[in-house]
UniProtKB/Swiss-Prot annotation:
This is Isoleucine--tRNA ligase. Its EC number is 6.1.1.5. It comes from Thiobacillus denitrificans (strain ATCC 25259 / T1). ATP binds at residue 612. Monomer. GO terms for molecular function: aminoacyl-tRNA deacylase activity; ATP binding; isoleucine-tRNA ligase activity; tRNA binding; zinc ion binding. Binds 1 zinc ion per subunit. L-isoleucyl-5'-AMP binds at residue 568. It holds the Pfam family Anticodon_1. The keyword Disulfide bond does not apply. Keywords: Aminoacyl-tRNA synthetase, ATP-binding, Cytoplasm, Ligase, Metal-binding, Nucleotide-binding, Protein biosynthesis, Zinc. Zn(2+) binds at residues 892, 895, 912, 915. Its cofactor is Zn(2+). It comes from the Bacteria.
Length: 929
């Protein structure tokens, strides 16, 4: 019997079935670097419309974690998608280099007794070393960017431009110095930014303290009662006993009703809505007698005695007082709370801060001098109890601000700091709304910004609406200095501040921040140096990263301002998004971005936060070593990043399965294009078979959908549709039907070349769709389609041929596919029963209604190819029904169809008539499939 296998057009490609991504990807990374792929992309994209995704700088400390990987992969997908969509989309990565974490690492290695200049030198070296480590991992992820020329906030030019932005903000009138309560970390020894504070549960002493009324006759008049000869106390409730030494007043709500109550402990004044709960707490509810009511406003100015210091404090009123808990009376210490500070300012209260940088009371403070605030708490409680001022004492578990670095409780303490005023109107600069405050400008800028997902707008608006002034000064060594000279007596800035800032900035451009630290004030001030102090403050690192729009976007010629997109984790609503917004509005009157995209945090497969203690941390390096970066990239794209991103070994295994389906499709496509040259074998769409035109219509429709999803950053929909297209539209339908034509038709026949034309366009479209996500696999596919020096990223979206009547074609074949699905169900039933093996062993009779019969009959003999059966007949009927029977015909040794004409040609034993025609005659005629 002849062997006809050699007469078939069998698939042939060096593209391997197994990806072996972990082994192969490093070779692609090396190739990209050797061939300067990023630079080549920039050259190819020159002159196109710009799309600028501005990189928020990760902190230069420690190995990258899975959250870093998510962030960089999302950015890379967008940049590559925009490049393929016809944009010039440069990507300049950056790093945040100053600040406390680096200081702590240097101290851990070298100790604390290091001269400041040497210490900063070590910090700079450490940051540079960390950047190189992180950079290698980011590159390994397949992220293309200007890695040889990133921006670093410690670069001299960047540091100098940071000072210039500070100067602009100072000139605009938004910067001021003041003693205000700020978040203070005792362990850091520095003020903290809002973004450096996180809330955790803490047990605190909750105490009710009575402030004795100093003028009982005055109180009687205000309550409109007869003379009072019994001691009276207004009772406050607090969870910070240590702040009582700094108390300057007791605040009531002006509109709340307050009650004068007679108890076994004397007369008490309590908010009416909280009276009952308070008396129960004190054990004084039994026998309590209500004497009178009045409003908080009527008690304003009433003098009270401090509970353990020999001084009087007034009653004040404020809208910040609530009736949620406590007594309706608030102990007010302007040096230890922002609300207290604000209301105290209206009354001219003293801003007293008896606590030092280390969290200890100054030695001169009565009772608690020299003690830490936490040690002072029990002593103050004991003192209050001994004096009869303590009415209740209990432990309260509540949410309390903690330092994000040390995980320790922080305090509010008033210090001399530099602030950017949220409610300052600033001076008209020609770019801002005249008379608008920074808060108003920021709110307007948020309104003009596009958000992905949309709920980010409300979140950022709420933060801007409620945030306090921005404390931008820090007491650190490794940071960009605030190069101001302040008058020793008045505290005023030197009148030449603008000029001096630029002189210092020019020096910093040459020598870095050391130029300021080493500066002798007399060099710049001359005789004035005797009257001015050189400030020792450094800038908040959020200011550093918040001015990248000026130091990077405006500075680098390949970029543009404003950026089209900022993309970071959802925590950056209170971090980089906000600091960039405020500095942008202060200098340019607008946000430095047109759109914001936020992604969620990574959690384990059970939705739990990752932590080393739980042992559920998944490192991106491990995933790349085990599965390859493309699997990590596919996982990121598969997940809806607007919420939490779940990852586990089980989830990754499912991603691998999805990848294999895509890879199998790619292998089939490439294997059947091995002898196809578009320059030689191209055909007009009119010459294609109908099912090929249908495949083109599906591809064109999907390309439009995917482009819309890419534009909306909806990557999980892209992956869903890509996998569905590969599995259902291609593998489960078109390619399955196509195998017979590709393998058995004459190699250069119209039928086969038409199929290859369709596959050529489909492959070129598919590889471009997937390349932003599966970048290494995309490049691997591209080597089979183009020269070795070429890259998929040097091209734009594939231009698919146009054709008329696509809507009708799609509708017609949707009906055919639905009918085919019914046939497949019946074939499977017969196969499971053991009557047939493959569907080619079956002969199908379709009993069809007139409309169905007309549709199926229009395919003529090609219907059997669509159904992948050896024979298909259509007969009229009142209802659609499928009948399947095993074929009694012989099996063709070449095409495996069961046909009555097998062995009809004695000179070609074992062949059916169409195989004889395809091999030795004019070839079979196909029109539809």
């Amino acid at each position: 019997m002849p062997d006809y296998k050699s007469t078939l057009n069998l698939p042939d490609t060096p593209f391997p079935m197994r990806g072996d991504l972990a082994k192969r990807e490093p070779g692609w990374v090396k190739s990209w670097q050797e061939k300067k792929r990023y630079e080549a992309i920039r050259a190819a994209a020159a002159g196109r419309p710009k799309f600028i995704l501005h990189d928020g700088p990760p902190y230069a400390n420690g190995d990258i974690h899975i959250g870093h990987a998510v962030n960089k992969i999302l950015k890379d997908i967008i940049v590559k998608a925009k490049t393929l969509s016809g944009f010039d989309a440069p990507y300049v990565p950056g790093w945040d280099c100053h600040g406390l974490p680096i200081e702590l690492q240097v101290e851990k290695t070298h100790g604390k007794d290091i001269p400041p200049a040497k210490f900063r030198e070590l910090c700079r070296a450490y940051a540079a070393e960390q950047i190189e480590r992180q950079k290698a991992d980011f590159i390994r992820l397949g992220v293309l960017g200007d890695w040889s020329n990133p921006y670093r906030t410690m670069d001299f030019q960047f540091e100098a431009d940071t000072l210039r932005v500070l100067g602009q903000i100072q000139q605009a009138g938004f910067l001021y110095q003041g003693a205000k309560p700020v978040h203070w970390c005792v362990d850091c020894g520095s003020a903290l930014a809002e973004a450096e504070v996180e809330y955790e549960d803490k047990n605190s002493p909750a105490i009710d303290v009575g402030f004795a009324v100093a003028d009982r006759a005055d109180l009687a008049r205000r309550f409109d009662v007869a003379a009072i000869d019994t001691p009276v106390q207004i009772v406050i409730w607090t969870t910070t006993p240590w702040t009582l030494p700094a108390n300057q007043a007791v605040a009531l709500h002006p509109d709340f009703p307050y009650t004068l109550v007679r108890t076994a402990r004397g007369l008490l004044v309590l908010a009416e809505s909280l009276r009952e709960a308070a008396l129960v707490r004190y054990g004084l509810a039994d026998g309590a007698e209500i004497l009178a009511h009045t409003t908080g406003q009527m008690l304003e100015g009433l003098p009270l005695w401090h509970p353990f210091q020999d001084r009087q404090v007034p009653v004040i009123v404020g809208e910040h007082v609530t009736a949620d808990a406590g007594t309706g009376a608030v102990h007010t210490a302007p040096g230890h709370g922002l609300d207290d500070y604000v209301v105290g300012s209206r009354y001219g209260l003293k801003v007293d801060n008896p606590v030092g940088d280390d969290g200890r009371f100054y030695a001169s403070v009565p009772l608690v001098g020299g003690m830490s605030i936490w040690q002072a708490n029990p002593l103050i409680v004991e003192t209050l109890e001994a004096s009869g001022a303590l009415l209740a004492h209990e432990k309260l578990l509540h949410s309390y601000p903690h330092c994000w670095r040390h995980k320790t409780p922080i305090i509010f303490r008033a210090t001399r700091q530099w602030f950017i005023g949220m409610d300052s109107a600033g001076q008209d600069s020609g770019v801002r709304d005249q008379g608008a405050t920074l808060r108003e400008q920021a709110m307007k800028a948020v309104e003009a910004t596009q958000f992905f997902p949309h709920w980010g707008r409300a979140r950022l608006e709420a933060m801007i609406r409620n945030r306090p002034d921005w404390c931008v000064s820090r007491q650190r060594n490794w940071g960009v200095p605030m190069p101001f000279f302040t008058h020793r007596e008045t505290g005023a800035l030197h009148p030449r501040t603008t000029e001096l800032l630029e002189i210092v900035a020019q020096r910093v451009e040459t020598a870095g921040i050391e130029a300021w630290f080493a500066l002798d004030p007399a060099e710049l001030l001359g005789d004035d140096a005797a009257h001015y102090d050189k400030t020792g403050h450094t800038l908040d690192v959020w200011f550093d990263s918040g001015v990248t729009h000026a130091c990077v976007l405006k500075r680098r010629s390949e970029l543009a301002h404003p950026a089209d997109l900022y993309l970071e984790g959802s925590d950056q609503h209170r971090g980089w998004f906000q600091s960039s917004l405020l500095t942008g509005c202060a200098t340019d009157g607008r946000a430095p971005y047109d759109a914001l995209l936020t992604h969620g945090f990574v959690v384990d497969g059970k939705g739990h936060k990752m932590s080393k203690s739980k042992g559920n941390v998944i490192a991106p390096q491990k995933v790349m070593d085990q599965y390859g970066a493309d699997i990590l990239r596919l996982w990121v794209a598969t997940t809806d990043y607007s919420g939490e991103l779940s990852i586990s070994d089980e989830i990754l295994k499912r991603v691998v399965e999805g990848y294999r389906r895509i890879r199998n499709t790619l292998k089939f496509l490439l294997a059947n294009l091995s002898d196809f040259d578009p320059r030689e074998h191209a055909m007009s769409v009119d010459e294609w078979l109908e099912i090929d035109r249908y495949a083109l219509a599906m591809t064109r429709r999907l390309q439009g959908e995917l482009q819309r999803h890419y534009d909306a950053y909806e990557f999980h929909f892209i992956v869903q549709k890509l996998q569905s297209f590969c599995s259902e539209d291609l593998g489960g339908f078109y390619l399955d039907i196509l195998k017979d034509r590709l393998y058995t038709s004459a190699g250069d026949s119209r039928a086969r070349r038409a199929a290859q034309n369709a596959l050529h366009h489909l492959t070129h479209a598919l590889v471009r769709w997937m390349a932003p996500i599966l970048s290494f696999t995309g490049e691997e596919v591209w080597t089979q389609l183009a020269d070795a020096d070429d890259s998929v990223f040097l091209h734009t979206r594939h231009v698919l041929p146009e054709q008329g009547g696509e809507d009708e074609l799609l509708e017609r074949w949707a009906r055919i596919r639905a009918l085919r699905a019914e046939v497949q169900k019946e074939l499977e039933t017969v196969r499971v029963a053991g009557a047939i093996g493959s569907s080619l062993q079956a002969e199908v009779t379709l009993h069809a209604t007139p409309s169905t019969a007309a549709l199926l009959s229009s395919l003529a003999d090609d219907l059997r190819f669509v159904l992948i059966t050896s024979q298909a007949r259509v007969v009229g009927a009142d209802a659609d029904r499928v009948e399947v029977a095993p074929s009694a015909a012989k099996k063709c040794d070449r095409c495996w169809h069961y046909r009555d004409d097998v062995d009809a040609h004695p000179e070609h034993p074992g062949l059916c008539g169409r195989c004889v025609s395809n091999l030795f005659g004019d070839g079979e005629a196909r029109r539809h499939a």
